[in-house]
Amino acid sequence: MLDFEFKSRYGIDDLLKIMKILRSENGCPWDKVQTHESIRTDLIEECYEVCEGIDKNSPEMLKEELGDLLLQIAFHTQIETEQGNFNFEDVCNDICQKLIYRHPHVFGEGEKKIKADTEDEVLKNWDALKKASKQQNTYTETLESVPKTFPALLRGEKVCKRAARAGLPINSAEDCIKKIQEQLGELSRRISLQSEDKGELSEHFAQNQQILGEILFDFCNLNRILKNDGEKALTYSTNRFIMAFRAVEDDIIKQGGSLDKLSGDELNRAFNKVISGM
């Protein structure tokens, strides 16, 4: 007989019990054979779907997606519980301990009370405590600790921010833009030379990739200086491009045409006309 109490409303303990049942010998054939690796992508997808709920300003969608993300946390925790490494209470305890330790301006008492009246002071404090708790002896280690699994744009911006907090000279936006313009000029020069050169394509690819990477990294630094979120900026522009593309295609279809029947020049003119008016 199934040892589970059906209710009109459930809580976190019920979720943990459901996961335990699903992973048990008589549980779900799919759930009980999953590993951290097999559901790793699911975890990433749920994080992005939570972000979509935020971007759409939809409380209902956000509630659902946060639930799906919580399921992933419970799933991974149950796997570790079965292996005797840690359980959900351990996870909650660790994050509570971390929050208390990293907020001495709120939870500190006596000599442990630290003054932090501004956002910058809080972040500076947070970084110092994080560095100490992770036994990072050098600033380079703080840069290396930014996960390599992060999207490249996000990782680049985080590295730039941490380098700046370590005392790296803060360039002005104008200096950063000038550097980007110089690199674009160098890229243009290389492409011109490559069009005349009969050398290996792989060599040209490596050269272009290197300088494009440097340009993108400098854009990460520019985002930091301007206090801009590169992910949001690129998402906005990508969405704007799709909207413009749809408008162009809809207009062509109304005229009885088709995108694949237009020349490149005709399509570019139509696209530029739409996007300039947005």
Ranges and model annotations:
Residues 1-65, 71-278:
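Flexible "arm" and connector segments at domain edges
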